[in-house]
């Protein structure tokens, strides 16, 4: 009987405290271009890879946020563009009960960290369907990127963007 009462009390406290829940993960946009195919397949494969990543977030309604992670990859062999691939991997998250700094970190680092493996897999699948070797992108440290961006904004005298 005591255990049941304690469990019920803990659930009530948890409901009143911070909450985080992944609601949905989806591909928002996906594109692939191989402007020099099929000629590029006959060249020696010595690629240079340029990766750009970006995150953005917006509040959908009270306590629900959309976070979009965009990965854009341009692969060249010599001066020729072999392919350009881009994915916008998005997620809807229920987030409530966080202070402003924790909310900013959650939206700017924690959520993109959840989305990255899905975006990486989508890019690899897209690239291999274009008959190129898989990219096998290395993991990204979104906490470090977030800290760098916050330091840059602080030195520039900018206020951190919020999704509210």
Swiss-Prot record:
GO CC annotations on file: cytoplasm
Location, primary (coarse class): cytoplasm
Protein name, per record: Protein-export protein SecB
Keyword Transport: yes
Keyword flag Transmembrane helix: no
Species, as recorded: Stutzerimonas stutzeri (strain A1501)
UniProt record similarity statement: Belongs to the SecB family.
Gene symbol of the encoding locus: secB
GO terms assigned for molecular function: unfolded protein binding
GO annotation terms (biological process): protein folding; protein tetramerization; protein transport
Domain of life: Bacteria
Subunit: Homotetramer, a dimer of dimers. One homotetramer interacts with 1 SecA dimer.
Cellular compartment(s): Cytoplasm
Keywords of the record: Chaperone, Cytoplasm, Protein transport, Translocation, Transport
